[in-house]
């Protein structure tokens, strides 16, 4: 069997015995096969130069380029911090973003309380004080008397006026509660409203016909009570409704006497501005001005005493 060398197979050249060339087909004799292979290699080289990277490398470069473009776009979209206006814009954007992320909790409305059992008097009075409207409504719907009271003759209306529970006051008045009902100290609803300081309740009572001149057992008017408790808006409304500025209580004190004694500066200014008399004397023969001087003298005496004691202490310390 004839053995061919690789060189003879590729080049088509004969070996020394002149036998190899006879094996090759006629078309590939005289080096034509070598020329064909060389031409094919040259074509492969051109393709390699035109496409120097593989397909995987092309995809990797494409992804990198896309990421770079996205990053550049994001940077361009960002606000440049060049002045205070830019800073303000950034802050507002941050706030909006935070607001969008914050979920608003859904607040469920409490289910209306349904009272099926009968309501007794103590529970009814307590409900008026604690603003439990369903309990009050149940008591009234059972045709009970709205003017029932405790041992001090204080009604549900008195209690609701003190605490400023407007809805309960309205419900009681619709049921026929007496506005002028007096407790053990002869205070009416208007006294209790002035003591509690709720202007809306006070306005409702006056609109429903409550007597602005009503006096309690100490002969105090609603204006006296509002001044003593420091409820400025209530006092101002009572004055606007023509309450008596110079009404005297059992001690002969006017609202101005009370304001001076309690050192309520805003009340003093309010009463004087609307024309309160500075020269009215109480049962002790003192005018509001006398009380001011008495207060000033008393304060001066206290400071003089403190200064004298301080002086004596310092002299003792020197010996």
From Swiss-Prot:
Record's note on what induces expression: By TNF, IL1A/interleukin-1 alpha and parthenolide.
GO MF annotations, alphabetized: DNA binding; histone deacetylase binding; p53 binding; R-SMAD binding; RNA polymerase II-specific DNA-binding transcription factor binding; titin binding; transcription coactivator activity; transcription corepressor activity
SMART domains: ANK (SM00248)
Coiled-coil segments on the chain, per record: 61-89
Alphabetized InterPro entries for the sequence: Ankyrin_rpt, Ankyrin_rpt-contain_sf
ANK repeats: 152-181, 185-214, 218-247, 251-280, 284-315
GO cellular component, one term: nucleoplasm
Record key words, sorted: ANK repeat, Coiled coil, Nucleus, Repeat
Protein name in the entry: Ankyrin repeat domain-containing protein 1
Species, as recorded: Homo sapiens
């Amino acid at each position: 069997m004839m053995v061919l060398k690789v060189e003879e197979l590729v080049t088509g050249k004969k070996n020394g015995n002149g036998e190899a060339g006879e094996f090759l087909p006629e078309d590939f004799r005289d080096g034509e096969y070598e020329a064909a292979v060389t031409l094919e290699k040259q074509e492969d080289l051109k393709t390699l130069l035109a496409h120097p990277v593989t397909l995987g490398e092309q995809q990797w470069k494409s992804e990198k380029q896309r990421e770079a473009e996205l990053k550049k776009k994001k940077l361009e979209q960002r606000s440049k911090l060049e002045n205070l206006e830019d800073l303000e814009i950034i802050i507002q954007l941050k706030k909006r973003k935070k607001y969008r992320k914050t979920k608003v909790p859904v607040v469920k409305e409490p289910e209306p309380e349904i009272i099926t059992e009968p309501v007794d008097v103590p529970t009814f009075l307590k409900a008026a004080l604690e603003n439990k409207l369903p309990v009050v409504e149940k008591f009234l719907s059972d045709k009970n008397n709205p003017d029932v009271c405790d041992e001090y003759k204080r009604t549900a209306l008195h209690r609701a006026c003190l605490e400023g529970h407007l809805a309960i006051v309205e419900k009681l008045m619709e049921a026929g509660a007496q506005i002028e009902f007096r407790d053990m100290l002869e205070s009416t609803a208007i006294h209790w409203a002035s003591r509690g300081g709720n202007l809306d309740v006070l306005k409702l009572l006056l609109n429903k016909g409550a007597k602005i001149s009503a006096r309690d057992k100490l002969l105090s008017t609603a204006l006296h009570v509002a001044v003593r408790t420091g409820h400025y808006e209530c006092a101002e409304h009572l004055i606007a409704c023509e309450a008596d500025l110079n009404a005297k209580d059992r001690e002969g004190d006017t609202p101005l006497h009370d304001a001076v004694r309690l050192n309520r500066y805003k009340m003093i200014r309010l009463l004087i501005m609307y024309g309160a008399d500075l020269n009215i004397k109480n049962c002790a023969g003192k005018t509001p001005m006398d009380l001011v001087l008495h207060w000033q003298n008393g304060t001066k005496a206290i400071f003089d005493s403190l200064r004298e004691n301080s002086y004596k202490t310092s002299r003792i310390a020197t010996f």
